[in-house]
C-alpha cells in the first residue's frame, strides 16, 4: 500500500492542488474537513484522476476528532507519510482592544492546538517513514512587519495575524525538534489571494493554487529550507 498524505482542512484551492500533486506522485490521499458534501466531491474528483482517496469528517478545532480521523485514515490507507495542515479558522476578532480577553485564545484552537494534535497522532508513522513530513499552509498576516500589521488591522484580521504568527513559530519549533529524527517540517506562506477562492483586490497579488502545491512538493523533496513564500 502506498504512503498516505493526510490533508486537514480540505477545500477548493490549495488543498485540492496539493492532493492532486502528491496523488500524482503515488500517494494515497486522506481528506479531512467538516463538510461531508465537500469531502465526497473531493474524493470523487481525485478518483477520477486515478488517485486513491478517502474522506473523514472532523472539526480541526477538536483534537479528539482529528486524532480519530487520522486513526481511521491509517487503518484504511496505511502508513502516514505526510501531514498537510491547511485548516484555517478565519477568526478575525476585529479590534483586539475591544475583544473579550478570555476569547482571544480561541484563535489558536486550529492553528496551534489542532496542528499539534495531528502531528502527535501521526508522529510514529512519520518517524518510521523514510521521508516523513509535516507541511503547513500559512498566510502573510503573520509576518513581523509593521506594514503587514497595518493591513491586518485595516482588514479586521488581528486574530488571524496572531494565529499565523504563532503557527510560523510552531513550524520552526517542530522543524528543530524533529530534524534529527528524520521528519521534515516546513511551511508555505501565501502573500496574496489564491485564484478562485475569494474576490480579487486591487494591489493584492493573485496566486495560483498549483504554484503553491509545487512549492510544497519542492520543500518536501529538498528537505532543506523550511519556508517558502508565494505572492
List each language-model region with its residue ranges:
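Conserved glycine-rich cofactor-binding loop
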Residues: 11-12
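Conserved glycine-rich Rossmann-like NAD(P)H-binding loop of the short-chain dehydrogenase/reductase
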Residues: 26-41
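Catalytic Tyr-X3-Lys loop
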Residues: 97-116, 160
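C-terminal helical subdomain
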Residues: 165-231
